Design a protein with these regions (language model features):
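Short, conserved beta-turn/loop elements at beta-strand boundaries and strand-helix junctions
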Residues: 23-25, 92-95, 152-158
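Active-site region of chymotrypsin-like
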Residues: 1-7, 14-16, 105-115, 141-222, ...
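Short, surface-exposed secondary-structure boundary micro-motifs
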Residues: 37-39, 134, 194
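Active-site substrate-binding loop(s) of clan PA
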Residues: 19, 24-25, 44-57, 86-92, ...
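C-terminal subregion of chymotrypsin/trypsin-like serine protease catalytic domains
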Residues: 181-285
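Catalytic-histidine neighborhood of serine endopeptidases
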Residues: 23-92, 207
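Glycine-biased strand-turn-strand hairpin within the trypsin-fold
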Residues: 1-35, 40-55, 226-243, 264-276, ...
Length: 288
């Protein structure tokens, strides 16, 4: 259920991880949604001004990211599936939840689906966990690491008052957006988004994803028991909701301090010069 997310922006390319959640629509088509970290696709975001009723309105748009799934047979890689996806919801890493919900544009891309841990009980500290992600942009391939649940939501409330959990699973460039799972039943308990050193990585817990989904009325993107809306309803959903300027100003100081403590977003990216040079095709991968 793990995939690579490839984001090709104007001045940079990036790669991270994601997880597929599959539903059937009213016509019986397999619809593949992908959860990833907001900062994995933030280079695809752009704004434009439009006139609505004589007033200026800022319209937020996203270029399609690419979803890459490796196909394996008898322990060998035999090919890759690549498909464009549209961005349905986005919450940025600085002022929001650092979450993004994508939808693969083609029906029946894959049949696999993640199962979210939606129980009210939070797994105990010391619980064995697994992380699956795309190491250094493996382009669809997955690497697995293990660790434990090392702390519940007291960590990093300083970043926009958001709750993170902590884990010792090994993370790497490309881990951002990848799932963290219970080792005993493989249920998804959170999304890896930040790191501050070896064995000290931060997870957006699934309970916070649930809070986000309830607020934006998209619990159908987590819970298969909830009916999916029709296409017209989905197409009218706003991609993002931004905090007020006042709130952003109040949070600036706390965010600056938190960045010093937890500096690493676990995304792989290629950065291009501000003035493109045809003789330079790619620059080396760097951590963002």
């Amino acid at each position: 259920v793990s995939v690579t997310i490839r984001s090709e922006g104007l001045f940079s390319n990036g790669e991270g991880s994601g997880v597929i959640f599959t539903r059937k629509d009213a016509k019986g088509n397999q619809v593949n949604f992908v959860w990833t970290a907001g900062h994995v696709i933030d280079n695809l975001r752009k704004e434009r001004e439009s006139l609505v009723g004589g007033s200026k309105k800022t319209v937020v748009e996203f270029k399609d990211p690419m979803i890459i799934k490796e196909i394996r047979q008898d322990g060998r890689t035999v090919g890759r599936l690549q498909m464009d996806a549209e961005v349905l919801k986005y919450s940025d890493s600085e002022d929001g939840h650092d979450l993004a919900l994508l939808r693969v544009r083609k029906f029946n891309f894959v049949k696999d689906s993640v199962v979210f841990h939606l129980d009210k009980d939070i797994p105990r500290l010391g619980t064995d966990l697994l992380h699956v992600g795309s190491l250094l942009g493996q382009m669809g391939a997955n690497s697995m690491t293990d660790g434990i649940y090392s702390q519940h939501g007291r960590i990093l409330k300083r970043i926009n008052k958001r709750v993170f959990d902590q884990t010792t699973v090994t993370a790497f460039p490309g881990s951002s957006g990848g799932g963290v799972y219970l080792k005993d039943d493989a249920k998804y308990i959170g999304m890896l988004v930040r790191g501050a050193g070896e064995g000290f990585n931060l997870v957006v817990p699934v309970r916070r994803m649930k809070e986000y989904c309830l607020k934006h009325k998209i619990m159908w993107a987590l819970d298969p028991k909830i009916k999916m809306p029709d296409e017209e309803t989905v197409s009218k959903m706003p991609i993002e909701s931004s905090p007020s300027d006042k709130k952003k100003a109040e949070d600036d100081k706390e965010k600056a301090e938190a960045k010093k403590m937890f500096p690493f977003r676990l995304r792989v990216y290629e950065k291009y010069p501000s003035k493109p040079d045809e003789s330079i095709k790619k620059l080396p991968y760097q951590k963002k």
